[in-house]
Swiss-Prot record:
Substrate binds at residues 8-11, 66, 123, 127, 131, 191-193. Belongs to the pyridoxamine 5'-phosphate oxidase family. GO terms for biological process: pyridoxine biosynthetic process. Binds 1 FMN per subunit. PANTHER family: PYRIDOXINE-5'-PHOSPHATE OXIDASE (PTHR10851:SF0), PYRIDOXINE-5-PHOSPHATE OXIDASE (PTHR10851). FMN binds at residues 61-66, 76-77, 82-83, 105, 140-141, 185, 195. Pathway: Cofactor metabolism; pyridoxal 5'-phosphate salvage; pyridoxal 5'-phosphate from pyridoxamine 5'-phosphate: step 1/1; Cofactor metabolism; pyridoxal 5'-phosphate salvage; pyridoxal 5'-phosphate from pyridoxine 5'-phosphate: step 1/1. It is an enzyme of class 1 (oxidoreductase). The lineage of its organism: Bacteria, Pseudomonadati, Pseudomonadota, Gammaproteobacteria, Alteromonadales. Catalyzes the oxidation of either pyridoxine 5'-phosphate (PNP) or pyridoxamine 5'-phosphate (PMP) into pyridoxal 5'-phosphate (PLP). It holds the Pfam family PNPOx_N. It catalyses: pyridoxamine 5'-phosphate + O2 + H2O = pyridoxal 5'-phosphate + H2O2 + NH4(+); pyridoxine 5'-phosphate + O2 = pyridoxal 5'-phosphate + H2O2. This is Pyridoxine/pyridoxamine 5'-phosphate oxidase. It comes from Shewanella sp. (strain ANA-3).
Amino acid sequence: MTDLSDIRREYTKGGLRRADLPQNPMQLFELWMTQARDAELSDPTAMCVATVDEHGQPYQRIVLLKRFDDTGFVFFTNLGSRKAQQIATNNKVSLHFPWHPIERQVSILGEAQPLSTAEVLKYFMTRPKDSQIAAWVSQQSSKLSARQVLEGKFFEMKAKFAKGDVPLPSFWGGYLVKPSSIEFWQGGEHRLHDRFLYTRQADEWVIDRLAP
């Protein structure tokens, strides 16, 4: 067994105080996302999306956040993917943003709701053409005999869609994750980290400080 117990560091970038918190967690998330981008973090919109299968087995993968507002968090995916199939069975999901360089994390619990075709198409048309073509090529989460099969299909579809717009695949869509709770974690000195949990109750958010 590899011993990693000596790998540690101190957290020195400051704390998070109750008096500084807005009542709406999306305002704090927007501020933290802006600061993560300004800090030029690698992939600040990358989030871990956790789902659960019918046997209770959890799965995780990294997905890019594409939009957020007071209603929730939006991402897009192949509707035949493992995550989409699991969401169809159990739409309770968890999102996690690990912004280690600025000593912050955000953890979100909520329910994923499918976006309308109009909303999906609006985003799909903003993607680079090669990305649109790639959406047609990959049967996400299915087994492949070799990478060459995938590449061959890509160039085949690229020739097919050489002229004009690439149509939206019927098996490609997106989700709005409506949060029921959002936790903000700020690293603190002596491992006394600051954690604040926003919990949705009716039409308001209740804020609690959690022990680190």
